[in-house]
């Protein structure tokens, strides 16, 4: 008890010269009269830092997936059924990325976008099984249906026209049908790219969607592909309603 009383009596002494009895003790620590008050602004700074850190983490967890539907193989590149692939390739060009990672039964790319992650996917399953690839990637990266945007061909629209939808049925499109079946949901936004109707009701549908465009149709399609790419990105940034107002209709 003597030591503590003597230290208290000499609290103004130099920390290296505190007398104990007849001698001088080299203090192992700096003695302070009373604890320093913790400045309030430090607490505010630390609080703001962790709130900012948490918000940043939350933003990074918001993932999007854009899917372009089509068939693999060079023989299908310019067919009507591959309009979705052409549109997603255009998105990749705009974002300066390559869709070249082979996984999830598809080719995909990953890019940081608007504070989160964006995945671009080209299923390699052929059109009618596209949902398998979509399900695998979306499940792995935890992308909900509401943030899966699908680009695909629509024979009910003339070349050069786009139509955006928040959700809905497959409408006779086997690729969309497969996605709905695999996800167990039809609540995902989509961008329909007009490729023209069959020239005659008796014309075989498979033959029609696997045919190529005429020169005149191709001329109308090229700007529509560019607008479809912009429309998909706009859905992410502004929502489906704003994107539909901007991009539905003529290219």
Region locations from a protein language model:
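Short, low-complexity intrinsically disordered segments enriched in A/P/G/S/L with frequent Arg
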Residues: 13-14, 22-27
